[in-house]
Amino acid sequence: MKLMIFTGLVLFAIVSLIEAQAENGKPCLPEYKVCTHAPGNCCSDLVCDCYGRYKSGAQIGRNCFCLQKGVIYKREN
């Protein structure tokens, strides 16, 4: 009985460790990928930059993309 309890605890610890490593090992989002729902997942040299979308002065949505840090993007006509 003690052996079964010990084995169960060891298996639980191993599964918990594997899940923790899987969460920490998530791949990061590369440049120009959408990060609206995952702002902290951009690769280390990128930042999740968000822009509001407006129509007739009312905000209709928001887009976020992984972009280079310190780079300023301007609209072209």
Swiss-Prot record:
It is found in: Secreted. One of its GO terms (molecular function) is toxin activity. Residues 1-20 form the signal peptide. Keywords: Disulfide bond, Secreted, Signal, Toxin. It comes from the Eukaryota. InterPro entries: Spider_toxin_CSTX_knottin. Its main location: secreted. Contains 4 disulfide bonds. Residues 21-26 form a propeptide. GO terms for cellular component: extracellular region. Expressed by the venom gland. Belongs to the neurotoxin 19 (CSTX) family. 08 (U8-Lctx) subfamily. This is U8-lycotoxin-Ls1o. It comes from Lycosa singoriensis.
